[in-house]
Amino acid sequence: MWNWAHLGIFFALSLLVCLCGFKKYVYFMSIGYGFSVAIIGVAMAVMSLMGIYPMSIANFIQFALFFIYGFRLSGFLLIREIKNAAYRKTLAEATGKEVPIFVKFFMWVFMGVLYVAQTSGVAFRLFNKADNSVCQWIGIAISAFGIILEAVADKQKSEQKAKRPDMVATEQLYKIVRCPNYFGEILFWTGVTVSALDCLVDVGQWITVILAYICIVFIMFNGAQRLEKRQMARYGNDKEYTDYANKTPIIIPLLPIYHLNNVDKK
């Protein structure tokens, strides 16, 4: 079943959090993104405590994972921007000029819809009053692993960049894959999707969950592509970087996709 009133609540909360994007449009997709996921998780927990949704350990773990994932991600991005002047410069160069207000308004609404869709796998389980299942627990395990991987990758990157600001991170997780943090995000949403596979009751729910998953995977690959483009502009003539990039998968470990841009291998 669909509970449009509750989806409307989640949408309104997401729009509220994403208002920060009117200051810098990139915030719609960064700080607003994480905090939207976090606040939707909190809303689900509160509504469950009010008796609106079934209460179970598995459900509350998923609410907690939404909060941890979103709060950690946006908190990390916010602190990095405040403390790191080099990152602020890179962010300014990457975003370029501010966009017109009507474009911001469209992005605001679109991102609000997207973030509700991304979390809809858990919402549909609540709406359908589905029992806990093996699928849900497998999804929880995948999502938890994704959060841990992303957090460790961010920490390792910060440590390595502090030691070598003139080079990309290449050690530890970065020996296995060049964008382990993006891979962690894909894993997190893979877990959310897997957890919902046995509780969806109509075509609309299936379409919403699958399209949201495709969108986030596309966004992660696009993010990796843009990151690689910036790295190529900065380190493209550095043999150490090119050797590393030519032999290390860009976003999925063991998958031999090394570049998402046209590259002349030297």
Language-model features, listed with the residues they occupy:
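C-terminal ends of transmembrane helices
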Residues: S14-K24, G75-E81
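Juxtamembrane helix-capping/reentrant segments at transmembrane boundaries
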Residues: K24-A38, A85-M107, M167-Y174
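Long, charge-rich intrinsically disordered scaffolds of nucleic-acid metabolism proteins
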Residues: L78-I79, Y87-E93, F106-A130, V134, ...
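Membrane-interface loop-to-helix entry segments
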Residues: I101-V116, I176-I186
